[in-house]
Regions:
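Conserved beta-strand/loop scaffold segments within soluble protein domains that form the structured core
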Residues: 42-116, 129, 134-235
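Long, low-complexity, mixed-charge
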Residues: 1-62, 69
């Protein structure tokens, strides 16, 4: 449940097979059992129900970490979702003290049934171009948890344009330490029912969080957004 909206009957079949382009200076770690213990108390904007969904999915996680300024070359994560796919992906972003990194996530609908395309295969005989949006039953869920250590900077860009999804769940949770800065940029361009929750805990002195949001919502579609900045540190 988020805001006054309750989403029920959610189930996932595993993680979506995205295309990750990770530049030098950012370390990628696959975590089959989920994110490391230090991420457990990072609360997301969609609440504990999303954490439970992640736990029940047993889909594992991917951790991206940096310990220097690598902002000149972003990490890019591209998704190409099918019309009947039910998937969940979990990402952790660890920006160590003094580091600077940018992560771009492009969550799109698949364009063809080319076997060389990025993403999970479609059911046999499915041609996404021939499937009307009213027939789509797909669900795409992404949870991203971030830890920014002292004086770290992270820019997280998420482009949500998955017209193949009946339901889109996007969850962000962050802990921001002394002098650290988190910038979230959101572009919402597609999806039948899109639910987005973002929570940043500013636990350090002069910690900072900004969110820049742009969106288009078609007739009869839903975009439910929730952004929380919890300031616990000193000014």
């Amino acid at each position: 449940k988020m805001n006054e909206t309750a989403v029920s009957g959610i189930s996932v079949s595993g993680a979506h097979e995205g295309n990750l382009q990770i530049p030098e200076g950012i370390k990628k770690t696959v975590c089959p059992d989920g994110l490391p213990e230090r991420f457990k108390d990072v609360a997301g904007g969609m609440g504990s129900d999303m954490d439970m969904l992640v736990k029940e999915s047993s889909a594992g996680a991917v951790l991206l970490s940096a310990d220097s300024d690598v902002s000149g070359e972003p990490a890019r994560i591209r998704f190409a979702y099918g019309a009947f796919e039910h998937s969940l992906n979990t990402f952790g972003i660890l920006a160590k003290e003094g580091s600077n990194m940018t992560v771009i996530m492009d969550m799109a609908a698949e364009r063809s049934v080319d076997p060389e395309r990025t993403g999970s295969p479609s059911p046999v005989g499915e041609n996404p171009a021939a499937v009307s949006q009213s027939e789509h039953t797909g669900l795409s869920a992404v949870q991203t948890k971030l830890i920014l250590e002292k004086d770290a900077k992270v820019t997280l860009v998420q482009i949500i344009r998955n017209k193949n999804a009946k339901t889109v769940l996007n969850d962000i949770g962050a802990k921001v330490a002394d002098g650290a800065k988190l910038s979230v940029i959101h572009l919402f361009l597609g999806g039948d029912r899109v639910y987005n929750g973002c929570k940043a805990e500013l636990i350090g002195k002069k910690s900072n969080f900004t969110a820049d949001i742009a969106y288009t919502v078609a007739d009869d579609c839903v975009l439910d957004m929730n952004y929380v900045a919890l300031h616990e540190g000193k000014k």
